[in-house]
Amino acid sequence: MADAAAPGEDDAAWERAIAAAVKNAPFSAPKTLTLDGAVKSTTGRLPSPSLLGRYPSLEELSVAGARLSSLAGLPRLPALRRLSLPDNRLSGAASLAAVAESCGATLRHLDLGNNRFADVAELAPLAPHGVESLDLYQCPVTKAKGYRDKVFALIPSLKFLDGMDAEGNDCLDSDDEEDEEEDEGEEGEGEGDEEEEEEGGEEGEGDEDDEEEGDEEEDEEEGEEEAEDEEDEAGADEEDESKVANGSKGSSGSAQPNKRKRDSEDDANGDN
């Protein structure tokens, strides 16, 4: 009876864990579901397909440390790109066949670290699909002779195995790449702001120089105008003085002939 009740008990625990995980999701149809350590399965299985099947929009699913020994019943997840199942008890081709059937067409990242896969042949169900990154760290298979070469040969789409490419170069996790791109974008924005501030400062200095030059030019023009006004006033004064002088001479010259005329007339009258 206890064995018969175990699956139901597991499902109840899984349902509570899933409800808690999606409670704070920003969308009604979450794209990421993390159940790491949320349930310690008594049956070694995932929850009933109907529980995970409620979220067909999932792109990332993580179920680490749940004591899973089988992936039977993994529902169809047509959008899943990343599946993380480390620290479980998984082994055998059957588990990976369930993965291939559930999300083989879209899956790109598969983490099976610290499980019980012991032979490269167990990975065969992944061969026809597009997995690009596979982690098998701390699995017995990693100790097999020629392990890396054999896995790369088995899965043509594979780019990274246990964090390294076929040449042994470290890969950069996609999350790290996104963080670096954001940092570069922020640095670019910061440099752009500094350049704008410098340009603004140069423009401000240029405006100040222009204003100073304009003020100097205005002062020079005002000085020239004042000088011209003084010259005009001096010229006018000279003209006035000249007119006055000329007028005085004209008056004395004209008076002498009149006096002579009167004297002549007086002489003539006396003779008569």
UniProtKB/Swiss-Prot annotation:
Sequence ranges of Acidic residues compositional bias: 164-241
Span of domain LRRCT: 139-184
PROSITE patterns tied to this protein: LRR
Any one GO molecular-function label of the UniProt entry: histone binding
Keyword Transferase: no
Gene Ontology cellular-component terms listed: nucleus
Keywords on record: Leucine-rich repeat, Repeat
Region (Disordered) location: 163-272
UniProt superkingdom: Eukaryota
Compositionally biased tracts (Polar residues): 248-257
Gene3D superfamilies hit by this protein: Ribonuclease Inhibitor
LRR repeats: 57-78, 79-100, 106-127
Record InterPro entries: AN32, Leu-rich_rpt, LRR_dom_sf
Family recorded in the similarity comment: Belongs to the ANP32 family.
Family matches, as PANTHER family: ACIDIC LEUCINE-RICH NUCLEAR PHOSPHOPROTEIN 32 (PTHR11375), ACIDIC LEUCINE-RICH NUCLEAR PHOSPHOPROTEIN 32-RELATED PROTEIN 2 (PTHR11375:SF18)
UniProt-recorded name of the protein: Acidic leucine-rich nuclear phosphoprotein 32-related protein 2
